[in-house]
Curated annotation (Swiss-Prot):
Site positions per UniProt: Transition state stabilizer: 233
Topological domain ranges for the Cytoplasmic compartment: 1-6
Result of altering residue 223 to A: Loss of transpeptidation activity
Induction conditions: Not expressed in the presence of extracellular iron, repressed by fur in the presence of iron.
Matches recorded under Gene3D superfamilies: Sortase
Protein's membrane topology: Single-pass type II membrane protein
Enzyme class (EC, first level): hydrolase
Transmembrane segments: 7-24
Protein name: Sortase B
Gene that encodes it: srtB
Cited InterPro entries: Sortase, Sortase_dom-sf, SrtB, SrtB_Firmicute
Compartment list: Cell membrane
Length: 244
């Protein structure tokens, strides 16, 4: 009798667990679907603005700033899902779990380090984004660890209110948060050169992009593991070339 009661309780608990787990899966699916729809609308809006103002970047971002004043840029990699606004908060925690409409989302936003200057670029501009495992946000950074992918995607597009840029990728590697790869400025040219040399040395891809202390670079950073918290990181670094 006791065993029968025990088994009944276990069955009830299992049903409850399945219901809760199923609810969370459905909830996540609905939220992700809504988030994709929101980004698609913004992508279409940005594309329309770009076609109208190809020579002048400022008007596009005036429109985006009306949506959220923290939208400071746009990053795109043709042929992939990387096509997002770049946010910048007062800290590096502001947009970890907020989208461009400041709604709480598990994927957060692509965001720029709060220390970076927008008009007068630092030596190293840093962008962060989640690795979420569904080919969105900064998932594409993992692909850069393969030479074959790099060969087909050497240039990333970046826009901000002050100009249009090409990001010429020259390094991709795995590291941890103990590695101080997120320095934004350097004491002198020698210090910066050492950083550039180390960035090239760590790379798992071969690149012929020439980078000197006169250049500015952009570092894209994401977690190595898409499904659990980790101190491991995937890093892609590019030389910044102003186009207009």
């Amino acid at each position: 009798m006791r065993m029968k009661r025990f088994l009944t309780i276990v069955q009830i608990l299992l049903v409850v667990i399945i219901i809760i787990f199923g609810y969370k899966i459905v909830q996540t699916y609905i939220e992700d679907k809504q988030e994709r729809a929101n980004y698609e609308k913004l992508q279409q809006k940005f594309q329309m603005l770009m076609s109208k103002h190809q020579e002048h970047v400022r008007p596009q971002f005036e429109s985006l700033e009306k949506i959220n004043k923290d939208i400071v840029g746009w990053i795109k990699l043709s042929g992939t899902s990387l096509n997002y606004p770049v946010l910048q908060g007062k800290t590096n925690h502001d947009y970890l779990n907020l989208d461009f409409e400041r709604e709480h989302r598990r994927k957060g936003s692509i965001f720029m380090d709060f220390r970076n200057e927008l008009k007068n670029l630092n030596h190293n501009t840093i962008l962060y984004g989640h690795h979420v495992g569904d080919n969105t946000m900064f998932d594409v950074l993992e692909d850069y660890l393969k030479q074959s992918f790099y060969e087909k995607h050497k240039i990333i597009e970046f826009d901000n209110k002050y100009g249009k840029y090409q990001l010429q990728v020259f390094s991709a590697y795995k590291t941890t948060t103990k590695d101080n790869y997120i320095r934004t400025d350097f004491e002198n040219d020698q210090d910066y050169q050492q950083f550039l040399d180390e960035t090239k040395r760590k790379s798992v891809i071969n690149s012929d992009v020439n980078v000197t202390v006169k250049d500015r670079i952009m570092t894209l950073s994401t977690c190595e593991d898409a499904y659990s918290e980790t101190t491991k990181r995937i890093v892609v670094v590019a030389k910044i070339i102003k186009v207009s």
